[in-house]
Amino acid sequence: MDSQNIRIRLKAYDHRVLDNSTREIVNTAKRTGAQVRGPIPLPTHIERFTVNRSPHVDKKSREQFEIRTHRRLLDIVEPTPQTVDALMKLDLAAGVDVEIKI
């Protein structure tokens, strides 16, 4: 696996769970001898929904809800076979979407 990079993108609604998962990945990669670049915080995607407060009248009375999707980016430079094995066995928290590109 010479001169290859592993790019890991993480997404979650809760930034604390996301940061803990990122920390676990970084610690695992460093423990196996790989060099880690990041975590790089990517822009938070905010999706807003506007609904009427009343089901019948009062169009001017509305309520807004939002979902925030937090994202992080990690690059693992020159991973060893032990790094890949350790990352495959890593058990991350529920609610974190992991996307890996080699």
Swiss-Prot record:
Q: Which GO terms describe its cellular component?
A: ribonucleoprotein complex; ribosome
In terms of SUPFAM superfamilies, this protein maps to:
Ribosomal protein S10
Q: Which GO biological process categories is it annotated with?
A: translation
Q: Which InterPro entries match?
A: Ribosomal_uS10, Ribosomal_uS10_CS, Ribosomal_uS10_dom, Ribosomal_uS10_dom_sf
Which residues fall in a coiled-coil region? none
| Protein keywords | Ribonucleoprotein, Ribosomal protein
Q: Does the keyword Phosphoprotein apply?
A: no
Please give one Gene Ontology molecular function term for this protein.
tRNA binding
Assembly information from the UniProt record: Part of the 30S ribosomal subunit.
> Which HAMAP family does this entry report, sorted A to Z?
Ribosomal_uS10
Q: What does this protein do?
A: Involved in the binding of tRNA to the ribosomes.
Provide the family line.
Belongs to the universal ribosomal protein uS10 family.
The molecule here is called Small ribosomal subunit protein uS10
Q: Which organism is it from?
A: Acidiphilium cryptum (strain JF-5)
Highest classification ranks of the organism: Bacteria, Pseudomonadati, Pseudomonadota, Alphaproteobacteria, Acetobacterales
